[in-house]
Amino acid sequence: MDRIAIIGGAQLNGTIPVSGAKNSAIKLMAASLLTDEPLRLTNMPRLADTRFLGKLLTRLGVQVTESDGSDGQQTLLHAPEITSGFAPYDLVRQMRASFNVLGPLVARSGQAKVSLPGGCTIGARPVDLHLQAIEALGAKIDLHEGYVYAQAPRGLKGAEIRFPFVSVGATEHAMLAAVLADGVSVIHNAACEPELVDLQECLNAMGAKVEGAGTPTVTITGVPRLHGATHAVIPDRIEMGTYAVAAAMAGGEVRLSNARPGLIDALLDKLKEAGASVEETADGCIIRRNGQRLTAVDIETAPFPGFATDLQAQFMALMTTAKGESRIRETIFENRFMHAPELMRLGADISVSGGEARVRGVDQLEGAQVMATDLRASVSLVIAGLVARGETTVSRIYHLDRGFERLEEKLGACGAQVRRIKGDGEAEL
């Protein structure tokens, strides 16, 4: 099993291109099931999660072709027909977002059998809201032996969908299912994340009639069919925020290109409050910290445009060496402080009580062997390793490979001493 080793102490100086958003790309890939014409996605990240979903889509009848073009990395998806409505456990378990093939399959072919998902083990994260949305659109849902059986032989029907609480995944799933439904669907209490706007833009380019994404109310007027399209995936705001934190942690000057700083205003405001410099550019931003120690600041996670829960672990790593005490409140997921004990192995002073962590900054972290527990926790350990004295080795980095493209290459190009150690012990520089 691969590991990543970091020798701390080097500043970061250079340019990091931000990849396309994983959380958007995987939903856009699922949209290919809705049409018999090709869907071309540009600015596509190459990640374990997109590979997993590509395998699943291939099984369902989608022809998946990756290439490099003038618009960067591209993926062409073409499903002239759905050859199977069965999404097995061995594929769906690898990534919970692959469950979102259920709605498109039912919308286009009238039936599906999809395994209940796996993925990051952060809290309960039930799929109940997804199923309620598909049922509201007229599908008959049965659960049996870990599988969801969904049928709508006469097609889906437009409906009012009211979520009791905000769910990004359920909102996306409802949008994917409703675009081919007969009539008008209205999603109330919809999530407002920018990835939903990206999904709306792609679906509309394919001929759908979706409006309101990015607001709490999304309206979808069903159409008989969708056609092919070309769509550029939005930049990954979590990757952007992660490298912004890494630059503030290690010091130096890092330019983030192909980025949209407005998507992470909540984080950038906190970086400035802590003492880092943030300068917006035509295609991104520049993060600087020139030697001065950062000051501890408090954060509380919240739905967009608030502080993203997917950046909480990274910010906790940043606060481990800040001057003073910071309080970090997690309001989105329970059990999302699993990275805290691993940061403590590096010398961090952290105490956790319920949904709040207190981080008392220390003068110096010390390198050690640590273990990634989930996707965002894994990169927080890499960030801490950038300043830890000596070598930090992070194991179980398959979590990292799910969401960060060429991380060692991007950090290494800015001066970080980071390398991948292959499962047989051989380092990959």
From Swiss-Prot:
Domain of life: Bacteria
EC class of the enzyme, as a word: transferase
Chief localization: cytoplasm
Annotated disulfide bonds: none
Pathway(s) annotated for this protein in UniProt: Cell wall biogenesis; peptidoglycan biosynthesis
Record-listed phosphoenolpyruvate binding positions: 22-23
Places the protein is found: Cytoplasm
Binding residues for UDP-N-acetyl-alpha-D-glucosamine: 96, 125-129, 310, 332
Modified residues (2-(S-cysteinyl)pyruvic acid O-phosphothioketal): 120
InterPro entries listed in its UniProt record: Enolpyruvate_Tfrase_dom, Enolpyruvate_Tfrase_sf, MurA_subfamily, RNA3'P_cycl/enolpyr_Trfase_a/b, UDP_GlcNAc_COvinyl_MurA
Cell division found in the keyword field: yes
An example Gene Ontology CC term for this record: cytoplasm
Catalytic residues, chain numbering: 120 (proton donor)
Keyword Transferase set for record: yes
Enzyme Commission number(s) of this protein: 2.5.1.7
Keywords: Cell cycle, Cell division, Cell shape, Cell wall biogenesis/degradation, Cytoplasm, Peptidoglycan synthesis, Pyruvate, Transferase
Coiled coil, from the record: none
Signal peptide segment: none
Alphabetized NCBIfam families for the sequence: murA, PRK09369.1
HAMAP family: MurA (MF_00111)
Similarity remark: Belongs to the EPSP synthase family. MurA subfamily.
Function: Cell wall formation. Adds enolpyruvyl to UDP-N-acetylglucosamine.
PANTHER family found in the cross-reference section: UDP-N-ACETYLGLUCOSAMINE 1-CARBOXYVINYLTRANSFERASE
Designated name of the protein: UDP-N-acetylglucosamine 1-carboxyvinyltransferase
Organism annotation: Caulobacter vibrioides (strain NA1000 / CB15N) (Caulobacter crescentus)
